């Protein structure tokens, strides 16, 4: 059967999965002719991180808009450390070894690493065992062992598998975590570090340590003079190799950013190189242009193009995170430029300004006071948010005077009008900007149900962004927009 032509392929957006799906911490891997994403699984309206079992999504490498859900691939109930069967599972990673796919993960409030396996990349996976020392002691349980967290696995070209792990924070945050564990009545003594992450080799059985854990990237207490200052390791270890360079990808102490370091070796001599992605677009913009918090992901090469996968935050908390992806530019020396937050993400180019789009693909979202860290302390009465209704239909809520909603990028060709579908508590106006030019105004009347509002615009043929700026005392919900 012939492959799809460009005209047959749908467009890809951010987030790249359906609006009702919440799979953060995405580790992308290409197996044969498909890219698979393995991540945590948040619950809409959940009260904490990772409340759902693991699912897997994949897409053909030639059509990154065509994602398939393979359903629940692992529940963790078979894990002998999951005594109640109700423990949550944090960020996983997967590696293939001799035709078997191994899923590495950690349970909540755990200091160990568990492993499940399958003969297919999409699972289902069955419990296999726990990573352990040569004497059989589970890693994390021996006296002096560091806490294990966010395992990343990497198979080198010679077949050797490396395991990366670690959570490294400030003393203040560590104290808060320990108090939270005590408050929950858990009798767990976790050795949390401030000195970065660890690397170790695995034996052929994928469970036994071939080498003891050694430090890799520095944390806040040992970064002086290393070049990592201000971007020390926090969590989310991931390793990749492209051409002759190894890339250690991680989330820094700043939380919102995915950083990277480079080396000629997978287990030593890494030099800090920069930021790959910020879910607040910090670094591309001087101030955040989207509500930001923790980030986790990695790089994948697909059909000769590099992409960084991460996640964004929605619904006024850090517990409903959605996967996003952006193109990366590799420089001649192997370094990458930071990726800008966009709405087009995995698309082959800018989106076509000639059809309907859902509002939730916004990559710019902020109140008149700007954007801030997404957590329970933020003023939900002031700030807009992406959320969903009882039918799992996504929309932007709490749009008020000064709210800015933006999309990047569109290919404008002969566009003469723009429409939005909204509800509004009062009459108001939306200014429409393309680039820095105001191209039209939407006059929105009070409407209790979704109503389409259209205005004529004067737009030159170009590739550019789209921004709506609300003026007036109305509070709105925003479902979708369209061109012509």
Residue ranges, per PLM feature:
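Carbohydrate-active catalytic/glycan-binding domains of CAZyme proteins
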Residues: 1-441, 445-484
